Curated annotation (Swiss-Prot):
Source species taxonomy: Eukaryota, Metazoa, Chordata, Craniata, Vertebrata
Biological process terms in GO annotation: intracellular protein transport; neuropeptide signaling pathway; peptide hormone processing; regulation of hormone secretion
One GO MF term attached to the UniProt entry: enzyme regulator activity
Transmembrane segments: none
Keywords: Chaperone, Cleavage on pair of basic residues, Disulfide bond, Neuropeptide, Phosphoprotein, Secreted, Signal, Sulfation, Transport
GO terms under cellular component: extracellular region; secretory granule
The protein's name in its UniProt record: Neuroendocrine protein 7B2
Disulfide bonds: C120-C129
Subcellular location: Secreted
Length: 208
C-alpha cells in the first residue's frame, strides 16, 4: 500500500528534476529541448528502484535489428514460397521441401487417383467434367465406392483404363438400392453372437 501511495509523490519530483526546477540544484535550469530521453529514462529507473519496482525489460528498436550477426532464417510456414522476413525484409525464409522419408503417405505420387472425379459446377459445362451429376449424398457414396485408389503395389484390373465417364454411366444405370423401412431389431429380433465388452461370454457346453 505504501509503495503505491508513494508513486504520485515521486512523479512530480521526477518532473521537477528533469526540468531543473529544484532550487537546491546549482545547475542552470534545463529546458525541454535540452532534456534527452536517456536522462528521463535514468531518472525514472532511479525512482523505480527506490520504490522497489522491478526494472522494465530492455527493448531494442527496429533499427538495431541490422546489428544482429550470424545467419538468420525462419523455417516453416504454409509453403508460400520464398519470403523475406524481419523489419527490413532482410531475413530470408527456408522453404521446407517434402523429400524422401519426410513425405507423409498421403503426399506420395502413387497414392492418388490417375483421373480424379470432376463434376461440373452447377449450370456450367466444360471438357473433362461430368455434366448433370446428381447432387445427392447417395450418389456421392456410390461414386466413391466404385473408384479404385491407384496404387502400383496392387494390381487393380483395368486401372490404366479407368474412366470417370464410364463410371458415371455405370452408376447411373445401376439398380437403385432398396431402402429398408422396417428395423427388425426394433420389432423384437435379438442380436445373436454379440458379447458386451466387459461381460463374460457364456458357451453352450459350460455347466450352469
Amino acid at each position: 500500500m505504501g509503495m503505491y501511495s508513494a508513486i504520485p509523490l515521486a512523479l512530480p519530483m521526477v518532473l521537477l528534476m528533469v526540468y531543473g526546477l529544484t532550487p537546491s540544484l546549482g545547475h542552470s535550469p534545463r529546458t525541454p529541448d535540452r532534456v534527452s530521453e536517456a536522462d528521463i529514462q535514468r531518472l525514472l529507473h532511479g525512482v523505480m528502484e527506490e520504490l522497489g519496482i522491478a526494472r522494465p525489460r530492455v527493448e531494442y528498436p527496429a533499427h538495431q535489428a541490422m546489428n544482429l550477426v550470424g545467419p538468420q532464417s525462419i523455417e516453416g510456414g504454409a509453403h508460400e514460397g520464398l519470403q523475406h522476413l524481419g523489419p527490413y525484409g532482410n531475413i530470408p525464409n527456408i522453404v521446407a521441401e517434402l523429400t524422401g522419408d519426410n513425405i507423409p503417405k498421403d503426399f506420395r505420387e502413387d497414392q492418388g487417383y490417375p483421373n480424379p472425379p470432376n463434376p461440373c459446377p452447377v449450370g456450367k459445362t466444360g471438357d473433362g467434367c461430368l455434366e448433370d451429376t446428381p447432387d445427392t449424398a447417395q450418389f456421392s457414396r456410390e461414386y466413391q465406392l466404385h473408384q479404385n485408389l491407384y496404387d502400383p503395389e496392387h494390381n487393380y484390373p483395368g486401372a490404366s483404363t479407368w474412366n470417370k465417364k464410364l463410371l458415371y454411366e455405370k452408376i447411373k444405370g445401376a439398380s437403385q438400392r432398396q431402402k429398408r423401412t422396417v428395423n427388425p431389431y426394433l420389432q423384437g429380433q435379438k442380436l445373436d453372437k454379440v458379447v458386451a465388452k466387459k461381460s463374460v461370454p457364456h458357451f453352450s457346453g459350460e455347466e450352469e
